[in-house]
Each structure stands twice: as C-alpha cells, then as structure tokens.
Amino acid sequence: MGFKDKILFWKDEVQYRTLAVADQVANRFLHSFENVYQGDESVEDADSRPVGLTNETLSHSSDFFVLPEERISTRVKIRRQNILNTTLILGMLIALVIWTAILSTNSYFSSSLASASPLFNKEGRVVRPMRESNLGLHADPQTRKSSKTLYDLLSDFDNAFYDDENMILGSLAFGENTYSRQPYVANGYIGSRIPNIGFGYALDTLNLYADAPGALNNGWPLRNRRFAGSFVSDFYSLQAKLNSTNFPELDEKGYTTVISSIPEWTDLQFTVDLNGTKWFNPQSVLIDDVINYNQNLSMKDGIVSTNMDWLNGMINIKSEVWAHRKIHSLGITRLEISLNLDALPDEFTELPVTVYDIIDLNTSHRTTLYEKGQDEDNKAIYMIVNPDNVPYSNAVVYSTCTIKGTENNFSPYNFTSDDRIARNYMTNLTEENPKVVIYKYTSVVSSEYNNDEPNPNVNLKFASNIANTAKGNYKSLLSNHKRAWYDLYNDAFIEIPSDSLLEMTARSSLFHLLANTRQYNVSTTRGLPVGVGGLSSDSYGGMVFWDADVWMAPALLPFFPNIAMNMNNYRNATHQQAIENAKQYNYPGAVYPWTSGRYANCTSTGPCIDYEYHINVDIALASFSIYMNGAEGADEDYLRFTTWPMVKDAAVFFKAYVKYNETLGEYETYNLTDPDEFANHVNNGAFTNAGIKTLLKWATDIGTHLGEEVDPKWMEIADNIHIPRSDSNITLEYSGMNSSVEIKQADVTLMVYPLGYINDESILNNAIKDLYYYSERQSASGPAMTYPVFVAAAASLLNHGSSSQSYLYKSVLPYLRSPFAQFSEQSDDNFLTNGLTQPAFPFLTANGGFLQSILFGLTGLRYSYEVTPRTKKISRLLKFDPVKLPLLPGGIAIRNFKYMGQVLDIIIDDNNGTIAHKGGDKPIRIKVPNRDILHDRNITSALYSKRDDDLSATDDYYGTYFTLYPNEELVIPLYDTKLNIDGNIAESKQITNLTAGVPGDVGFSALDGNNYTHWQPFDKSDNAKLLIDLGFNSTHVIKKGIILWGQRPAKNISLSVLPHSERIEQLFANITDLLETSSITKGGLPLNQMLGQTQSNVTAEIDDDILALLNWKGDDLDQLIPYLPDMHLLQEKFIPILKDYPIKPNQRYYEEIIDDDIIKLLPSNTTEFTIDYNSIPGGEKRARYVVLTVHGTYDDDDDLKGATIREIVLQE
C-alpha cells in the first residue's frame, strides 16, 4: 500500500507503524536540511511550515521509541500527496537504522530531551482538521442531578440557592450582618461588600460559630472588627504599629503598609414617617420587620440585587449595586421604594419618605479627612481622604443622584458632625404614586489610579467628570457594563457537565478573580497589587503575599495574560526596593519581603531575612511563567528587562545566602520558614531549597539564552544543595522533622506543582512517597490552597485510582461558603476550635488554587521549555498529560486557553484528550510525556535506597512531540489509570455519605484507589453509612471484599444491597427526566403515571436507605415524595448481606515510630470478608446500590471521631 492511500491504524497496525516510521525519517531529513540552511528557528517564531509540507499533509512523528501504543490516536488518518514506491520506503528504513546508530553512539545527540537540539527532536504532528462537533461534552443528567446534593454539604447552605442556568447565587434569609453571608461588587479598581439590606456600611454583629470576646474580629495583623465597607485598589496607609505582628522589633526599621478603606460609596439611607420616624439603613432595620427577602449575586455581570418587604409587608424595597466593568472609577446604586398596595392599612393616605445621599468618613478605616463639600452646580457631594500617614496620596469619593421621572431635587443636608456630607430628597408615596426610584452615581478616583496624581483638585475634577457624565444614563451604562462582563467570559469558560457544584465553583472562582483584578488602566510604574481578600475586605491588611504570585496570577494567565502581567509588574515596580532590602542586610542581589503594600520594605509583618525566603522564588516563577505562556508582550524584551533582573538578582542573593557544609559536601540554608508556618526558623526547608536549585537553573538558562553573564557557581550550588530525607527516602520538610508533625498547608508537595511545571524536572524521585506521606499529615483546619496542589500532584504522579478527583472535592466542600460561593481560608471558621485563627475572607488564594487544579491539574498541562545545546537558546513548549477522570463522567472543557498568542480549547472527555487550535495564525509545540516511567506501587521503604539527587530530570524521561497548526486539533487517548486492587467493582464509583463525616473529609476518598486518603465518621457512637452506586446498567453479585483502615479500624461493619430490578433502573431514569423536563408543582404528570404504575392508593413506610437513595439521585425529591408511597417499588428494602461483622486489626501498633521519630509509610490494617448467600433470603443477588455501615472504633479511646476508611473494595 502506498502513501497515497488513507491508512487507518485500527485496520492495519503493521502498515501504519511502517509508514509512520518512514514518515518520521522523511521529516527528520527535511528538518535537518532546513536547520542547516535556515538556522535553528523554534516553532514559536516560524511563520511558515517546513518545506514540502502542506495543509493536506498529515505528518505523523509519534515517538515510536517510547510512546505507548495506546497513546496514539486511533482516529488519526495519514494522508500523503506524493506517490512513494516500496523502494523508497525500504531506503528510508535503512537510513533510519543508520541514523539511530549515530544517535545512540554520539553522547552529544543522546542527551536528555530537556536540552536536545530541535534538529533531533522527535517533532511532528498527529493531528486532524478541527471538528467543531467533537468539541462538546456530554454527561448523564442523572449524575449532574445527583451532584446537586453536594450543595447540602457546604457550610450555611440551608437558605441559599444557585440558579445554574443564569449563574445566580442567592440567599432567602434576612439576618444579622456577618461577613460570610454578604456578597460584594467589584471591578478590579473599586469594590464594596454589601450588607443585609443591599447597600450602605455595616459592622458585623454576628459570628455563626462563637459568642466570645474577639469573635467579630478579623484576623492577623489588624484584628479589627469585620465590616461591610468599600475599598479602592492600591490605597495603602502607613502604620507605625499594628494590633498583631510577628516581629515587632522591625517596626523600628520601617512602618508597615496596610490597606485603607474609603468612605462607603453605596451609602443611601431613607426614613419613613409611620408612627414616628423609622430609618432604613443597616444599623436600624430589625429582622422581625423584614419578610419575603432575597439577595442575589449574578456572576454573569457582577450585580448584587436585594429585594424585601418591610414593616409588615407594607413597603417593598429593591436595590441593585454594581461597579462598572469598563469605567473603573464608577459605582452605581439603584434604589426602588414602593408601596405594597394590598398590604396598606384601611386608614392609609400617604407615606412621607426622605432619601439621603451620604458620604461618611466614619465608614472608612485608616484614613484622614482632607476636604468635603457640596457641588451645587451639579447637585453633588464629595469627600477627599488621605490614607493614614501618606499625605501625598488621596482618594476622592464624588456622588450625585437622580430621581426617575423628575428633576434632581436633592438638596443640601447639614449633619451636626463635621465628618459627614449629605443631600436629601423628600416625597410622599400614595396609592396613585406608589413608587420612587433613585439612581446614585458615585465616582472614586485615587492618586494611584490617576497617574500617581498627588493634587486632590485634579482628582476631584476627574471624579466629577465621570459621575456627571454618567448621570441620567443608567440603561446605557448597564448595557455597557453587562457587555463588558460578557466579553470577559467570551475569553474564558470552564465546563464540568457531570457536576453542578464543581462547575459552579470553577465559574465562581473565575468571577471572584476577575472582579478583583483589571486588564487596563493600570499604572506601569505601580502594577496591580492584589491582596488576599481583594477589594471587599481588609483581611491580612490587604497586603500582597505569595498568594498573588503562586495562586492567583497563574490561574488567570491562561485566560487573561495581561492581568497576570499587571500583577507581576507590581513586583517589577518594587524590584529596586528589593535591591535596597538586600543592601540593608549586607547581601548582594535583591530580596523581597514576605508582605508588601505601598512599598516593599522589610517590616514587622514582612521580614526579608530569616523568614520565608521562598517568596523570591515564587516571584521569579510567576514572571518566568508569563514568558513561558508567550502572550502578546511576553517576548524577548519581557524576558530580558522584566524576568531576567528578578531571576538574576535572586540568584545572586541565594549564592551569598547558602552555606557550604564540608561534612555533607552540600550547600545548606539556615533559619528560614517554609510555606508550612507551623514550623518557623528551621534549617534546609525542602521547598525553599528545591526552589533555590530550580531558580539557579532558570538563571543559568535565561542568562545564557540572552547572552548575559552567567555565574558558574549557580549550577554548582544547584547540583549540590541539600534536600533533607529520611532513611526511607521520604523528603523531610526540614532538617530534624519528627514523626508527629502536623502540617499547616501544602509544602513538600509544592515541589511537584507548581515548582516543577516550568521545566522537565517535574517528577521527584521520591515524590510519590511524599504525596502519600504528607496527605495524611495535613492539618484538618489548614488553609484552602492545600488540596488543589494535591490534585495536580496526584494527576501527574499516580497511575492508579482517581484521587486527583477526590482531592478536588476536598478542595471545595470544607472551604466554600454559601450563599455567595466565597472561599474561607480555613475549613473550620470557629476560632475557638481551630487554634484561634480568624480566617481571611474572601480568600482569593483558594479561588486561584481551585482553578489551577482544573487548568493544570486534571489536564496535565504545563508550561515548559527546552534548551538547544548548540545555540543555548530557549524554546517554549506546552506539555499535555491527561488521564481519565472516572469521578467526572463526561469530562471537562476549558474554552479559550491562551498560549503563545494562540487560542485553544482543551477538552478532556471520557476517552480522549483534545487540544483544538481555534485562534491565531502560528503553530505551537506540544509534548506528551510517557507515563510508563511512573511507578506508584511497591514503594515500601526497602525498595528505594536513599539518593543524593532530588529532582529526576534523567535521560530516561522522554515524551512525544507534536506540532499543532491553526484550525487543527490534537487528539490523544487518555491514560487509563489502573485499579488499585484488582477486581474492585467499587473503585472510582459514585458515593455519598448518609451520615456526617469529619469536617474536610469527602466520601470519594473511600473509593479513589489511593490507600492514603480516607473518610472518617464525625461521631464514632453513631452508625456511619456510605451509599455506593456501582453505575448505570452495572449490577454485580458481591461475593467478597476488603476494607483498608489505616491505623484506626472500626469495631464492626455491615453491608446491605438493594436487589436489582429493571423497574428500579427505570424509576431513577424517569425521576431524572421528570425533574429535568417538568415540575410537579406546575401540574406535571404524577410520577406513578410517568412510570406506568397503577398501584392502589396505599401508603407504605419507605425504608430510610431507599429514601436517602431517592434524595441523592433526585436532589429535590421532596417535591415528589407525596407521589412515591403509592408505588410498590418504594416498598423495596436494602437487604443485609453482611451484618455486624467484627473487625480484628492485623497490624501492630508501631510504638517505635513515635519514640524514635521514624519517618516512613506504615502498612494499613485490612479486613477481608466473604458473603454467604445461602444464609440470605431472597432470590436476586445482583445489585447496583450498596450501603456500608461502620460502627465504632476498635480502640476504646477518648477520640470521638470514628474509624478511618481508606479504601472500600468489593469483588465478585
């Protein structure tokens, strides 16, 4: 068969492989001649295809040396225009043999792929023309419907709701003001947290978890009372002392900069004259006076809407608040006050209403009044404030109002105090004129926004122009605002069709990050500082931590690279101060402080020395990753003038900082703190030392690429820096770590991700053991950025199970707060039980981490580069290593992923991973790693000897290269992860806990094929139940099983099954259809009619487990329950097939582990059981639904928590 013929792999594998080999040879020769005559141009700079290749030529050069056959797309067709005869094929095969011999004997050519010349890269394309029909995802609606029960596991979801279709989050309960129940509006420049009534300023008056002194306070370092207030970006004050700080002695060396809040820009209030004057503001409205309440946040457009009836339902109040997405300094409030005519008393005649437009200094924090006044010409008010101790910075708040249908009749109003300014409007509501609508247009302009303009009068004029131009144009402004949000989402979208909660979390995370950042109107001399709490909170003083560099910016980079660049430009703008910091401590180079604000000086909250040195690696990583992404502007000039100075000066500093230990023959670090802040001032922090090693390699590669001077000492240190390890080859978090350690947050695991995603040194020799070991030692109340790291690490390291997805659920369920899908920093918000930690809120770090767990974790995408040995030039590429996602049937889709200035769709369905090149005019290079080199089994300590090298960028780590051209798609079969235990029919199936688990635990961990994750009952005195669904049309006869307990086995277990019935399958199929297509409350068909049932109207008691199953599969089955008792199907019961089976531990207590501080993985207690069906009544043995009941713990100790269920194994 000749090249002209279309050859399908599945029809003739031998011919396919022969032609693929010949095709590679031909293309390698073509590339060889091109490189000889045209020079070494990387694909990213090439404007045309290689000579001899056309759009009709599908050049397949999969790496036949190392790529597993199952990774080759069975749908790829090879088309050739040229008719080549058999002689040419044989000639090429002979040439291939000779060529291979040359490569294998020449050490220059056989170097690792991470540094191989493009001339000899296994480069080519396994692609096809892009097919839009293949870019959609499909998922079982029953699975998605079942996923909605996960919302019930979120904190405070009782009176919350989510409108999936319209992306609206909401609350139906009016209560006291508390931070976690409040939405906010923001546009990347201004923001305001919205109190219960929908506008205005409010101090918190309720803590949901504790009533104790300090319960209403925010956390370190301000420890002030939480409040719903307004903020403007980069408006930092200077504070000589703070309420709480780690290193107060450093206050003598320089003040700390923390964010100032500004006078509340949504502040409207009104009074009604009804048996006396009654005020409508957040301080005065009583809970008992409000009915029919709802407050909504639309993630589609960032508008907060509030609606309620007040004073016995007599008055309806509606409000809308939004920060204009394009006109960054403009905030708008719409207030509608109307009579409910049906609720008016018989004697009603009129209701006097007075509306106040107010700007109040008392609603700001850490500010000084500069000026306030009335602008009579424009019937407006304004106030100018300075942040504390910064007289050369100011912010103007300028407000003007209009009344719908009338002239602006607001008049000046004089308060008795000098720190407020107001105008008011009086009207009477009657049955003939029952409504008044007020529009408040507020402009906020700060010096930092207006080109660092220090003159307040200039900023006042700017603010006046914005507000008065906007006045009277509400509809057009609203349309423009919504369009701006629509355009943002048109650039970025994530789909998870099988799981409503995860998809909502992805979309809300994207919303929260976008709401607190902006693409333009950012000072090039300042950049964009983004605090942990964004623009609606002063958590952590609004200061900038590594959270911005490692967690937030990388999540935005694939969608909005210009925002990531703006954030990194803040570090560039403060780089000179980092140089001064190093000089202050007699070091060369530059060193950044742990916290930054208006300045980047060393402070009591943010030391530069003897603390978290990894911040310097984090900042360099963020900048280098922008270059790796290759967006517009992230070019060679960006690398030379932005990234290189940061990387170089960090390398110079670290060269001076490390100390050589002659006994070890390695370089060490001293008196530092790693990301795990439970362990302060330790030596040889693993993440810090690995970061130094990696950064020094970056410095060498970048400097050589740019032709800059490179210090050879950098690589000497990189090759010989000490990474502490135990005798069992587990990476120690720091030298001297003991076996009783509790880890605050992800630390050692960060060495895999994100530290490894820039280059090919992403697989640590002992990373798998590290992942297992440290997953058991995370603090139950640790911060919310921990488990997204485990998602990425598990996806890239483990070839068994589905724990990357169970970790994904652990990233959400303990931390996400209803009703407005905001992350808390902690899994436990009760400061009396979590170690006196008041959580940051909202915690944008978690939003960034969660997005990264999807963008880079589940997809296996990594930015990477290679260095050509001959030219020493860097060539950028994208690594793609997707695996099957059994817990997410239907897969995930990432729309409009930006890379090298091109636009991609990333699709992971049930069988294939697809990268579709749908925008741009340049090809991109993609590398698919070979997962067969991973070994995540047989990792007992005896198998590995202690090694000196820590990062395995060995010559054995190969992959396959593809070139993807515009309007083409790369399709590769997903890596099919293996079963953890052979024959386990329950692994990676759907599961739900019917009883409470320990906060932070998820039921998926018991079926994820990872023996080092677990689910644990909250109370060991109760019968804990887990309900397992073995899958649609998947029934089994369970004959035996195994339970892995870890170190805390149960006292006994029971196992029950629901005998299989085709009618039961039909029941759930029709319930799903009914819930998706009709509504019982709207007169839809009764369920028994849908099923064709004609049972007598006899009510029977429903088995509790049946009811739990129905609620799991139906979500809102409470609507259907009145119809269900008539059906005999619901009289079915779960049948016990194993009852009160006693548990006996089979592993001893390893006392020496504690006594001798031995760091190693311990074997798990296991229980094996068999099922004797001879003693079980009933004929049907097959089942789809299984309930595992776990009671007590084997040890009678004081710990109230139940047994740890690491893995459930069911076998036929």
Curated annotation (Swiss-Prot):
Periplasmic side: 104-1212
Highest taxon of the lineage: Eukaryota
Parts of the chain on the Cytoplasmic side: 1-82
The protein's role, per its UniProt record: Periplasmic/secreted acid trehalase that catalyzes hydrolysis of the disaccharide trehalose and required for growth on trehalose as carbon source. Growth on trehalose is not restricted to respiration.
Annotated keywords: Glycoprotein, Glycosidase, Hydrolase, Membrane, Periplasm, Secreted, Signal-anchor, Transmembrane, Transmembrane helix
Active site: 677 (proton donor)
Protein name, UniProt field: Periplasmic/secreted acid trehalase ATH1
Source species: Candida glabrata (Yeast)
Effect of gene knockout: Abolishes growth in trehalose carbon source. Normal growth in glucose carbon source. Decreases virulence in a mouse infection model.
Encoding gene (name): ATH1
Binding site for substrate: 546-547, 744-745
Subunit structure: Homodimer.
Catalytic activity, EC: 3.2.1.28
